[in-house]
């Protein structure tokens, strides 16, 4: 095919060159000669076939191939298909009428005579669409009238039988046709108004007596009685399915095995009487699983409902993409600002690192200045007019969310429970453990004694050494910041530094293990606590509302999401034995190094 098309293109080029050379219009440009390709090909075809009359009457040299009025025929290589109408219009309907006969094809539920039609039609009639609609309505009205007559006849027979009068003395009409049409017109109007006209449009089974009457009315004189016995055998074979084995199948006597089919079980002992354990049919066994069918049905309905919901959601989402957000959608956006952590010059180089290395800040914890006298809290806390900004750090933004809806109720339910993060969302943990105030932890603990401070410790504190916690806390305790404690005057700086040095050698997680946000599990807790009890004796000073170490994954997740868990359980045995609130003891005791 490609060679044939190429040959046609070559012929077109040769014809174009011959026609262009014989043209007498020397003023035609190259563009005009290129446009004359299609007319020249038409001229060559017209001269060969002699089918174009106007082109034969005009001499070739006098034609203007570049004229816009010149005829441009369609290409012989590419022709557009002629559009055909896609709709089908019916002009009329032809109805063929067939006489009734005994069918011998169907199997009715009762009786022995079946209805059929003759192989040749007896009449033919053509209707227009409007006429056929009217004929259908008339036929339905007639069927409904006949049904009403049958119902009326049955009602009269029931009344006579209830009264005890014999049918011969009652004088009832012998057939439906004997009932007058005028007597059922009122009932017919009521039935049409009630919507019963649509009922007659569906095929209804006729009883055996009605079928015999229709056959006799159609001219059938003799009804074959042999069909009745054949139909009875067919119905019996359909009802008699499955084997008649009693719980145990014998392949030699089982009807299913002899027929080469599987035993079937829809429910107990139907259609086959064998059980699952006693079936020995070599062809196998098929059981109806009702649970599987119901599960498939439920899954299908669920899938269809999900598809409908997804389609409706896409329909609702499509017009909403180009529209501006509504005021209700804007109200869903949180209006509170996210807390911005301090810069590295305030926290130090190790404040936000993730290498988990220890950084000792005990030497610089005492060189800090106290806050303003008018500020009752820690000087590092932001004032009332502080507006926190938005930081790109996603972890800081996640940890800065507050949980005001849960914390208030938990504080009212139990005293000393783990508080919410509302009181901790306005400052950074470095303000607690920072080096600017020696009594920062103690003063903050005293001012926030109503709730636990451990739930608000963020992830940035994992890199701080335990010495800053003890040093700041002990020095604050000497100033009387912690209520209910006292420092003996005989305690000097040397003992304090010795305690600090002995505690600074341990891992920071040993003290943070008691906190819910840094719980590493009961195994790590028991191992570390047993090691630390042999070498160090922790100071006795009360801390408000410490939470027991819970699950590591749940505590870490709750610390990220900002949800606080109530301290409903008792403290760790280590905390119970070391931190006692009942007996006031000295804050510090000499520890052997």
From Swiss-Prot:
GO MF assignments: DNA-binding transcription factor activity, RNA polymerase II-specific; sequence-specific DNA binding
Organism classification: Eukaryota, Metazoa, Chordata, Craniata, Vertebrata
Task performed by this protein: Binds to the consensus sequence 5'-AGAGTG-3' and has transcriptional activator activity. May have a tumor-suppressor function. May play a role in apoptosis.
GO process terms (BP): apoptotic process
UniProt entry tagged with the keyword Repressor: no
Region listing for Disordered, in residue ranges: 1-66, 313-392, 478-497
Segments crossing the lipid bilayer: none
Protein name: Cysteine/serine-rich nuclear protein 1
Family, as annotated: Belongs to the AXUD1 family.
Record's keyword annotation contains Transcription: yes
């Amino acid at each position: 095919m490609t060679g044939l098309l190429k040959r046609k293109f070559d012929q077109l080029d040769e014809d174009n060159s011959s026609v262009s050379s014989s043209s007498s219009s020397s003023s035609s440009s190259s563009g005009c000669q290129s446009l004359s390709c299609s007319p020249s090909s038409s001229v060559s075809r017209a001269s060969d076939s002699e089918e174009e009359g106007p082109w034969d009457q005009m001499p070739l040299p006098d034609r203007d191939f570049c004229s816009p009025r010149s005829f441009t025929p369609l290409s012989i290589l590419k022709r557009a298909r002629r559009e055909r109408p896609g709709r089908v219009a019916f002009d009329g309907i032809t109805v063929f009428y067939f006489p009734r006969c005994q069918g011998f094809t169907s199997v009715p539920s009762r009786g022995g005579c079946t209805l059929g039609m003759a192989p040749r039609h007896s009449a033919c009639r053509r209707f227009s669409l409007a006429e056929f609609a009217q004929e259908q309505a008339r036929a339905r009205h007639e069927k409904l009238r006949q049904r009403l007559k049958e119902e009326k006849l049955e009602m009269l027979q029931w009344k006579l039988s209830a009264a005890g009068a014999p049918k011969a003395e009652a004088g009832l009409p012998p057939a439906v046709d004997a009932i007058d049409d005028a007597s059922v017109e009122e009932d017919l109007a009521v039935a049409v108004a009630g919507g019963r006209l649509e009922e007659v449009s569906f095929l209804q089974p006729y009883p055996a007596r009605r079928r015999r009457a229709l056959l006799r009315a159609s001219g059938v004189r003799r009804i074959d009685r042999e069909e009745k016995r054949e139909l009875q055998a067919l119905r019996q074979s359909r009802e008699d399915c499955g084997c008649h084995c009693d719980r145990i199948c014998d392949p030699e006597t089982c009807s299913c095995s002899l027929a080469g089919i599987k035993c079937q079980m829809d429910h107990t002992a139907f259609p086959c009487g064998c059980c699952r354990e006693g079936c020995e049919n070599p062809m196998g066994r098929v059981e109806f699983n009702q649970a599987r069918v119901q599960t498939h049905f439920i899954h299908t309905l669920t899938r269809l409902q999900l598809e409908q919901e997804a389609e409706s959601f896409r329909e609702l989402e499509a017009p909403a993409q180009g529209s501006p957000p509504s005021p209700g959608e804007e109200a869903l956006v949180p209006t509170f600002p996210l807390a911005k952590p301090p810069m590295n010059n305030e926290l130090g180089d190790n404040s936000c690192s993730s290498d988990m290395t220890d950084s000792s800040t005990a030497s610089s914890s005492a060189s800090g200045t106290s806050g303003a006298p008018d500020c009752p809290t820690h000087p590092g806390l932001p004032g009332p007019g502080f507006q926190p900004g938005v930081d790109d750090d996603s972890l800081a933004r996640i940890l800065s969310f507050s949980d005001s809806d849960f914390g208030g109720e938990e504080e009212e339910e139990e005293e000393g429970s783990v508080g919410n993060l509302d009181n901790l969302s306005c400052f950074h943990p470095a303000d607690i453990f920072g080096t600017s105030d020696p009594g920062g932890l103690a003063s903050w603990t005293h001012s926030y004694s109503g709730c636990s401070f451990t739930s608000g410790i963020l992830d940035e504190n994992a890199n701080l050494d335990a010495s800053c916690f003890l040093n700041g806390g002990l020095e604050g305790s000497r100033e009387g910041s912690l209520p209910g404690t006292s420092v003996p005057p005989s305690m000097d700086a040397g003992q304090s530094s010795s305690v600090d040095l002995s505690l600074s050698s341990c891992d920071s997680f040993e003290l943070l293990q008691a906190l819910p946000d840094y719980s590493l599990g009961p195994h790590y807790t028991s191992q570390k606590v047993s090691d630390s009890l042999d070498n160090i004796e922790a100071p006795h000073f009360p801390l408000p509302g410490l939470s027991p170490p819970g699950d590591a994954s749940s505590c870490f997740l709750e610390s990220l999401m900002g949800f606080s868990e109530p301290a409903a359980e008792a403290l760790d045995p280590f905390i119970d034995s070391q931190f006692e609130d009942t007996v006031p003891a000295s804050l510090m005791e000499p520890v052997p190094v």
